[in-house]
Amino acid sequence: MSWDVIKHPHVTEKAMNDMDFQNKLQFAVDDRASKGEVADAVEEQYDVTVEQVNTQNTMDGEKKAVVRLSEDDDAQEVASRIGVF
C-alpha cells in the first residue's frame, strides 16, 4: 500500500473501558481505509486475530476504528506492547 492504514492508537477514557471490559482497541486510521484493510493491518502489525471492526468518521474529520480482538488475544497486553500506557 502506498499509504499507512493505522495512524496511531486512539486513547480516551471510553477507549480504556473498551479495552478493559470488551477486549477492544481503538485507532485513528486513514480516511480511505476500509474495514477489511484495517483488520488486515492490525493483524499484521500487532500479531493478533481480529473478530470485528467498526469505523466512525468523527466530527474532527478523522476516521476512528474500534477493533474487537479474539478471546485468545488480550487487548491490554497489546496496548502495553504498542505503548498506550
UniProtKB/Swiss-Prot annotation:
Keywords associated with the record: Ribonucleoprotein, Ribosomal protein, RNA-binding, rRNA-binding
Species annotation: Haloarcula marismortui (strain ATCC 43049 / DSM 3752 / JCM 8966 / VKM B-1809) (Halobacterium marismortui)
Family listed: Belongs to the universal ribosomal protein uL23 family.
Record's protein name: Large ribosomal subunit protein uL23
Quaternary assembly: Part of the 50S ribosomal subunit. Interacts with protein L29 and weakly with protein L39e.
GO molecular function terms attached to this record: rRNA binding; structural constituent of ribosome
Keyword NADP: no
Coiled-coil ranges (or none): none
